[in-house]
């Protein structure tokens, strides 16, 4: 019998109510604006806003206008490529998560890494990446592979935990493990967004969760650090913060402004 590793995390103090409140914020947005009236242009705009926010969190200096004109730097261009396939990749995430994550890296790092490094999970013979400022050192390759494999297996199993909780854990694990040579932050945030789509939180991708994380950027690295080193207290705090980011992401939807 498989173990539901996500359900106990959803039961940490305050997490269930925070996840419900964030889900309500998204539901209200979709209900008030009319889910059936959401066009592809609104999805494209939301994804573009998310790409800019995610790239900015990774250190991009490109402006929203440069992103729109296709004149952005490598980080922002990679984030835009991610958005181009996010909706197609989302349905595959529960069946083949590792393949989705490696594809996300291929897209994100096309301008940042050599071709043979695209979609490549690091080994013990390679340097440990340090591409998310403010985090403690990433674990060695053996621990990374063990945890990433466990995460992938758990994603394919049924869970009673809210999709928001699962998405936040996936985001944090990829960011903390840094399984790729580069662009791990972009991949982590895109993986979270994919799950929010796949688990039906925002099936038409008109919210901007990356924008929510950007609004809360002052606590982004510290939140991930606490997740990595503070045990269940750090996990709880990260989950609460992620629920707040999703709520703010709903407020940043092009359906609002």
Spans of features found by a protein language model:
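FIC/Doc superfamily catalytic core
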Residues: 1-257
